[in-house]
A protein has these predicted regions:
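N-terminal Rossmann-like FAD-binding beta1-loop-alpha1 element of flavoenzymes
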Residues: 48-77, 469-470
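Residue-level detector of alpha-helix initiation sites
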Residues: 52, 56-58, 83, 232-233, ...
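Glycine-rich FAD pyrophosphate-binding loop
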Residues: 67-93
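Residue-level recognition of phosphate/Mg2+-coordinating polar/acidic sites
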Residues: 83, 104-107, 124, 130-148, ...
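N-terminal glycine-rich dinucleotide-binding loop that anchors FAD/FMN and/or NAD(P) in oxidoreductases
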Residues: 89-119
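Short beta-strand to alpha-helix junction loop
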Residues: 119-127, 147-166, 233-237, 381-388
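Predominantly flavin-linked oxidoreductase catalytic cores and closely associated redox partners
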Residues: 166-357, 362
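A conserved FAD-binding loop/helix module that cradles the flavin
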Residues: 231-233, 237-240, 245, 445-471
Length: 471
């Protein structure tokens, strides 16, 4: 091989022992087979077979980075559905919010309720700027919105999908759809035997490199390295083949959802957007902020979705039956709110409550709040009195609603839970329980709020796995 010829030339060159050692480790890092007579002959097979289980964002990034670092490796992405990157296709309303500028994030815990310490560590190697640059260098111009969310300039998720699929095709990464992993067995030769359930529909992606396989049935294949990038599972059973190997599983539960509100009159305000607001759960330290959207079932918008993420386990433990507090005026200092209300009373004593909206609240919401307090819209501001002012301030800053269950957030279904990070080598993301098995993406106990943070975690963890899976 050309690398053997290079090594022969190296032997004739005048280089120090230290330089030779560095060159050895460099080529070992690239998984290049060394000369057969080298005293530290690389013990990897010349054709390293790698399986990536899950054709999502993390899986593709792991495969592409692995192929870049270990070009000799035979890499196949296995996807259980009939097409890859389905979740990428719908995220951001079909526009693909692929990352975030993180300019408004001072502490990663704000974005990653679970896994923030690991993400901080991994961001030193591949962060949002690296992801931004990677896509632009691979032909996808990006734009950053005012809310710091990053989208393809085309505003079409297929720009991202086409980039990933075409890059995989160009590098020779194979893609097999309709392959569902059902079991993993450790073999004596340190390979991993994978059992797949193959559906009747032929499972290769059109235009991508693919090996032949049975049209349906059970298929067994052994690999030297395996990366699990299957995303989150709504039920514990989805992790059975991993728990059977000895991995600890943090209970999977939903972590990004809307709230069903019991108050029928409140839901009549559907379509009303209030921004920004504070949301919180009384009696806890759980809180969030951002725009709030009133829907026909209750509450949505970033202020609710963020709260649902941070409070995922608390909400699950309470069967999604809790009180939510809304601070409609986005002001935590009650004294300042009192000053504002007193200023309105002094300046407009004879005007009706309905005619002056504190903090420029939406008209429909303000009328609803007046009636919720038990006042007539025609009541004059001068007639509020101290008791009335206190009630108004409390309503503006701590308005309570009963949550009766959770709704769905169709643009981004996320779960918390998954493979316990205590089972993972935090540098390589290789399993401590099963050698040669790696993890990336939401299958790990890492999840984020809405805004491109979950996809960034997929790019980052996929990149790290791709750096090490061929070593």
């Amino acid at each position: 091989m050309i690398y053997y010829d290079f090594y022969a030339k190296l032997q004739k060159s005048i280089v120090s022992a230290k330089e030779k050692e560095e060159l050895f480790f460099f080529y070992q890092r690239k998984a290049v087979p060394l000369h057969p007579n080298h005293p530290k002959k690389y013990d990897m097979p010349q054709s390293l077979h790698i399986a990536i289980i899950g054709g999502g964002a993390a899986g593709f990034f792991a495969a592409l980075e692995a192929k870049r670092n270990f070009p000799h490796a035979d890499i196949t992405i296995f996807e259980k559905n009939s097409k890859v990157l389905a979740k990428v296709e719908i995220t951001g309303g079909g526009r693909c919010n692929l990352t975030n500028s993180f300019e408004e994030i001072s502490d990663l815990k704000q974005a990653y309720p679970r896994g923030h310490k690991l993400m901080k560590r991994l961001f030193k190697r591949f962060d949002y700027q690296h992801a931004f640059d990677w896509f632009e260098e691979n032909g996808v111009p990006l734009v950053t919105q005012e809310d710091q969310c990053v989208f393809p300039q085309s505003q079409d998720s297929h720009s991202i999908i086409d980039c990933l699929v075409n890059t995989a095709k160009r590098l020779g990464v194979k893609i097999q759809c309709n392959h569902q992993l059902t079991a993993i067995t450790e073999l004596e030769d340190e390979r991993l035997l994978l059992d797949f359930k193959v559906s009747k529909e032929k499972g290769n992606l059109s235009g991508a490199s693919s090996a032949s396989h049975p049209v349906s049935g059970i298929r067994q294949i052994a690999f030297h390295r395996v990366a699990i990038t299957t995303g989150g599972h709504p039920k514990q059973e989805g992790f059975k083949h991993l728990s059977d190997l000895g991995h600890a599983i943090e209970q999977p539960i939903p972590s990004l959802f809307t709230f069903n509100i019991a108050d029928k009159a409140f839901k009549n305000l559907m379509g009303t957007v209030v921004e920004p607001v504070y949301t919180s759960i009384p009696g806890t330290k759980l809180k969030a902020e951002g725009p709030l959207l009133i829907t026909h079932w209750g509450m949505s918008g970033p202020a609710v979705l963020k709260l649902s993420s941070h409070a995922a386990r608390y909400l699950h433990e309470n069967n999604y039956q809790i009180k939510i507090s809304v601070n409609w005026v986005h002001e935590s200092n009650r004294s300042l709110v009192e000053e504002n209300i007193q200023g309105i009373i002094i300046a407009n004593p004879q005007k009706q409550l309905a005619s002056i909206r504190p903090y420029n609240l939406p008209s429909r919401l303000w009328l609803f709040l007046i009636q919720k307090m038990g006042y007539a819209p025609e009541k004059k501001w001068s007639e509020m009195g101290k008791k009335g002012c206190n009630l108004l301030i409390e309503t503006l800053t701590n308005d309570l609603y009963q949550v009766n269950g959770k709704g769905a957030f169709k643009e981004e279904f996320v779960t918390c839970g998954g493979i316990s990070l205590s089972n993972i080598d935090l540098h390589t993301l290789e399993s401590k329980v099963c050698p040669h098995l790696f993890f990336a993406g939401e299958v790990l106990d890492i999840d984020a709020i809405t805004g491109g943070f979950n996809l960034q975690a997929a790019w980052t963890t996929g990149y790290v796995v791709g750096q090490h899976i061929g070593e």
